[in-house]
């Protein structure tokens, strides 16, 4: 099938497009393969291939991650890369007392209550009706949090896609358009039969969705943030279609690049609730800070945030190419980072099955991710970036 165009890249107007990836196979003048029911995926820099939808899911079942870049082929703008934005992050934490006071109001009960409902949708597969309904419900929860706060100018908007499930963007305006982003993906998938079988997706990525939602709720309790007094704008993103090749986040950041948005940082929270793998391996509970395909400066600052605001430590780990939505931000030149629940090899093996349920999650561990998210967003909202 032919995937509808997602990305309007404005190539002629862009001044940040640089040389294509070396040794990348060029796309010809036609994209006939798309009309033959195939999709163009990128499994690594310079590693592209046309695959069927079933072959996409087969690669996912084998643990392979990729960008689905079919839309770029349709726009005839592939291959390309973007110049990376250079940002100097703070050398030290500046708001410890205030953030810790805010963090004391983070609620495990709210995390669990939210996830109990969120995982009750049959699946949050991005092309399913229940995936659309889950997005509507999530949007309503975000809308309610903003309405119940004293925030001035805060808003939540739908970012529509050609498929049924939209992405969601909540914005807290600051004094400038410099923007700090945290994200999670709202979709789930059962890789055995994506369109049919249940996919509760409690950890992947209901946990990240709940984590950043709770961080948003508490951040809005800061009068300075809620009244728009922070120097920088803050956005919370919940992406559609991550499991299908980072489709939702690619569309969002492609639009941001076209609009010349000044995104200073992006943190992804994907899988924040499973600690049994670490414990069963005989290790101390910790969060996993990803070190490959991320921005080094932002990642180094996150280690300071974890040390300053979390009750557990961190381990450094790798997850590979295009392993979550932060990769889309990086693809379009924005500094990005990713924090996961553990060292990558100890992360949940229940994901993408019917067994990825709330009962497998550690809400004390998830609360640490919420503290880290809140701390990072608050620090960067008030930083000179």
UniProtKB/Swiss-Prot annotation:
Transmembrane segments: none annotated. It is an enzyme of class 3 (hydrolase). One of its GO terms (molecular function) is aminopeptidase activity. InterPro entries: M28_fam, Peptidase_M28. Its cofactor is Zn(2+). CDD domains: M28_AAP (cd03879). The keyword Secreted applies. Binds 2 Zn(2+) ions per subunit. Zn(2+) 1 binds at residues 185, 204, 270. The keyword Hydrolase applies. Zn(2+) 2 binds at residues 204, 243, 352. Its EC number is 3.4.11.-. Keywords: Aminopeptidase, Disulfide bond, Glycoprotein, Hydrolase, Metal-binding, Protease, Secreted, Signal, Zinc, Zymogen. Belongs to the peptidase M28 family. M28E subfamily. Monomer. This is Leucine aminopeptidase 1. The gene is LAP1.
